[in-house]
């Protein structure tokens, strides 16, 4: 952090002094030129991004418009859309101490008529889940993880999906609330090209190892058995062939995070290879607002979905809420409706919806296909 602050004060600030904050692309390009590396390795993506976001906020203030409106203008987007929240309500993978291999089990209230109704649905399912977990696994299992989700001692992915489905039914939202998953499969990809669903238990007998073909079958089963509509990082980040196969089958949205890292170069490659059909947008992976807009533009032109995302380690900053509305991403992933740094984003989205009044449009059933 001190190095990033030092780079901002000593190198970036003097170079940008006097530039117009409304001219986001010019300023972002200036910082990229100052850095001079492909991966922003000299000044650091976190230093460059902090300035890029601050400039974006200053540009909105100079124009006297809300941040989301300024972002929409920068992107040349005329549609302000409230996104479908993808609440991470059960944690597994490397984020949790249970036996669950897959990292996130999420709910998406696509059947809501407004963002505020989607929030209510999400909260009700979340609390129904808490009741089920308490009854089945005990009070201890109700502790929450980094992103506000529960991490009960679930033994299998099927058990996790079943629990989420049960909570949706208990809350009375069958058909209106769907399920999403972040498999984060690179975490349990083995040297012999297999996927070890028992990777947390080492050493193990290898009975839970699966081939890419078996993983493909497993995802098909999940989508048939449960209302799963979105799967993120289903295969290892460089294992593009089975990922493309799953995308072609068109049984759900296939989201690229590790495979794309919000990099326009990798996005272009994935579009050509038809490897996935949705972009996970993490601004700190690419490092500037301009490049983030470019990645979203490419994704939308390819007919992809876009999910704006937080990070596991978050702050109270709500910038990504405005970003999701301004870029009409249609989806946002920023944790469970729990923990203040997660709710900060949801509260900002509620404020934006209120501010837009009768002009507020919720993505709802169109969550995957919103053009500019």
UniProtKB/Swiss-Prot annotation:
What CDD domains does its record include? enolase
Q: Keyword set for this entry?
A: Cytoplasm, Glycolysis, Lyase, Magnesium, Metal-binding
Write out the annotated subcellular location: Cytoplasm
Asked whether the keyword Magnesium is assigned, the reply is: yes
- Known PANTHER family for this protein? CYTOSOLIC ENOLASE 3 (PTHR11902:SF56), ENOLASE (PTHR11902)
Q: What is its EC number?
A: 4.2.1.11
**Catalytic activity as recorded in UniProt:** (2R)-2-phosphoglycerate = phosphoenolpyruvate + H2O
Report the domain of life of the source organism.
Eukaryota
By its UniProt entry, which NCBIfam families does this protein fall under?
Answer: eno (TIGR01060)
Residues reported to bind Mg(2+): 182, 232, 257
Identify the catalytic residues.
147 (proton donor), 282 (proton acceptor)
What lineage does the source organism belong to?
Eukaryota, Viridiplantae, Chlorophyta, core chlorophytes, Chlorophyceae
* Pathway given in the UniProt record: Carbohydrate degradation; glycolysis; pyruvate from D-glyceraldehyde 3-phosphate: step 4/5
Membership in a protein family = Belongs to the enolase family.
For the keyword Isomerase, the answer is: no
What are its GO cellular component terms?
phosphopyruvate hydratase complex
Q: Which gene encodes it?
A: ENO
Question: Which prosthetic group or cofactor does it need?
Answer: Mg(2+)
Q: What is this protein called?
A: Enolase
Main enzyme class: lyase
Q: Bound how, and how many: what does the cofactor note say?
A: Mg(2+) is required for catalysis and for stabilizing the dimer.
């Amino acid at each position: 952090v001190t190095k990033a602050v030092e780079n901002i004060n000593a190198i970036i600030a003097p170079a940008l002094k006097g530039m117009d904050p409304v001219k986001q692309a010019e300023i972002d390009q200036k910082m990229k030129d100052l850095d001079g590396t492909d991966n922003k390795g000299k000044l650091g993506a976190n230093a460059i991004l902090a300035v890029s976001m601050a400039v974006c906020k200053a540009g909105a203030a100079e124009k006297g418009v809300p941040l989301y409106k300024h972002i929409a203008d920068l992107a040349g987007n005329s549609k302000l859309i409230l996104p479908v929240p993808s609440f991470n309500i059960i944690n597994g993978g490397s984020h949790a101490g249970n036996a669950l291999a897959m990292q996130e089990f999420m709910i998406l209230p696509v059947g809501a008529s407004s963002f505020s109704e989607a929030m209510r649905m999400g909260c009700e399912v979340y609390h129904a889940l808490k009741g089920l977990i308490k009854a089945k696994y005990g009070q201890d299992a109700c502790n929450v993880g980094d992103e506000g989700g529960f991490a009960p001692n679930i033994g299998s992915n099927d058990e996790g999906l079943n629990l989420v489905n049960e909570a949706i039914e208990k809350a009375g939202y069958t058909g209106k609330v769907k399920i999403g998953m972040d498999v984060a499969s690179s975490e349990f990809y083995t040297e012999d090209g297999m996927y070890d669903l028992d990777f947390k238990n080492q050493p193990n007998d290898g009975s839970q190892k699966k081939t890419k073909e078996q993983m493909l079958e497993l995802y098909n089963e999940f989508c048939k058995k449960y209302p799963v509509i979105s799967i993120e990082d289903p295969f290892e980040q460089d294992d593009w062939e089975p990922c493309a196969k799953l995308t072609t089958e068109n049984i759900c949205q296939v989201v690229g995070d590790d495979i794309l890292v919000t990099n326009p170069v990798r996005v272009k490659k994935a579009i050509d290879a038809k490897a996935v059909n949705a972009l996970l947008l993490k601004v700190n992976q690419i490092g500037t607002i301009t490049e983030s807009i470019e990645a979203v533009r490419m994704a939308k032109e390819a007919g992809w979905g876009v999910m704006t995302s937080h990070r596991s380690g978050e702050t109270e900053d709500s910038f990504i809420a405005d970003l999701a509305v301004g870029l009409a991403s249609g989806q946002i992933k920023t944790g469970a409706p729990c923990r203040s740094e997660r709710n900060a984003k949801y509260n900002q989205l509620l404020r934006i919806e209120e501010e837009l009044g009768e002009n507020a449009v919720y993505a709802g059933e169109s969550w995957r296909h919103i053009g500019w």
